[in-house]
């Protein structure tokens, strides 16, 4: 490969181990699984570490394949490493801890919003590249993002004001289903 970022692909029909009869047998073996997942909703959640490790493009290729097989996808991403890095860059003396609920000040909330927006745009851009040099090249994947989560403020607990900290109250499932009905991720 001339560019280390390019993903090398080989046509299954050209690979020696996939002679036409072998390919047909393999295809027949996977067909029931394809039928089983078509139309199902998969929620794919991953942490910000995946993006930090530059594995987003590989994930997008896999998700595009699932989408092409008729799987409806809901993608949920984390951002802890990126938020902590942004807080450090801005000189804010706070680090988010996974699984720990702490009061969220306005400046911390702003960092969280900036990072979440940046990651969302990175994900959308990865899907919008047309997946060059992959078996999914020229596929059109549509992304719909929105405020599908309704939050509930934590409020004051044991005399501690949790400021802008919230927890999930509910998900707007009707809006998610409408987006999925449009064959969007």
Where are the regions a protein language model picked out?
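N-terminal glycine-/serine-/threonine-rich phosphate-binding loop
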Residues: 1-75
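Active-site glycine-centered loops adjacent to acidic/histidine catalytic or metal-binding residues
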Residues: 78
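A sequence-level detector of short, solvent-exposed, charge-rich linear segments
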Residues: 42, 46, 56, 85, ...
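Ligand-binding beta-strand-loop-alpha-helix segment within the catalytic cores
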Residues: 17, 88-184
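Terminal amphipathic helices with adjacent charged low-complexity linkers/tails
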Residues: 81-83
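Glycine-rich loop at the start of a catalytic domain that most often binds anionic cofactors/ligands
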Residues: 55-61, 85-94
